[in-house]
Amino acid sequence: MDLKDYKNVVVFAEQREGNIQSVAYELLGKARDLADTLGEKVVAMLLGCGIKDQAQKLIEFGADEVIVADCPELKDYLSEQYTQVVDQIVKERCPNIVLYGATTIGRDMAPRIAARLKTGLTADCTKLEVVSDEKSNGEPQFRMTRPAFGGNLMATIICPNTRPQMSTVRPGVMQKRQREEGRQGVVTMFVPKFDTSKFHVKLVETIKEDKAVVDIADAKILVSGGRGVQNKEGFDKLQALADVIGGVVSSSRAMVDNGVMPHDRQVGQTGKTVRPNLYMACGISGAIQHLAGMEESDFIIAINKDKFAPIFSVADLGIVGDLHKIVPMLTERLKKEMEK
């Protein structure tokens, strides 16, 4: 096939226990933008057991067609079963672009699909776009951008010689479209052909992690600390501020690597992407990999001793000074204001 014969933008719509994950709707929003630019359609792949009724939601969030594989073998995610089905669908449909969430499932499955199709895969993308310019000789070109070299620069990657072009995108990076209730689309049932001789793994039990704390990706207010916070005592100051304003404490990679904060509180390319209403960056210099995880916040306040810190380039309000003095003062002032 000629590369121009590959059409449409396909999204793997991840579901767990019959519930479509938010990242699927986020990817549909971006897929809709890409497809409209290319003059192509958006197709969602929905795999599971007893999930056919969920297809309409995907249409209402931007899909033109939903391909549903609904059978007992797909009740729980197992690498080989899901990979076989997605591989069959992609080979049958020959899409131009395929998008996956950079979740535990997406990160496990997408490389397997890429290897079977002998195509490329760009992981953990922060930006996806179709551009026509001199570099592409005026032809529409799909470009995938992600942090590289430890987050010290942003790399824009193309896949010029093979199809489909594939990317994984972390939850929270892209924005959902407004749901269009009643939107019309096509639901196509797909009957997979399994090679059971390759089913070498059996799911014995699923043990869910007990998460007693709020997921930072869901928080409306985040008070985030970096290397400048220094230690646990420094984070206690941030926690006091967060308690006053109804926020959640998060951190940069440096403080996770130092063992001061747990990984589930990390913001950035190797942590979580967040979009709170308010993001307070305290003692965070602003490495590219951190900015990639928080720059879409509605309002950003940065506190840093270094007036040249990169974090100020994305901040709506910047305070140059010692956070260990500023944060306690701010906390006390806010307490007094709230007591009035």
State the predicted function of each range.
Residues M1-K340:
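N-terminal glycine-rich FAD/FM-binding segment characteristic of electron-transfer flavoproteins
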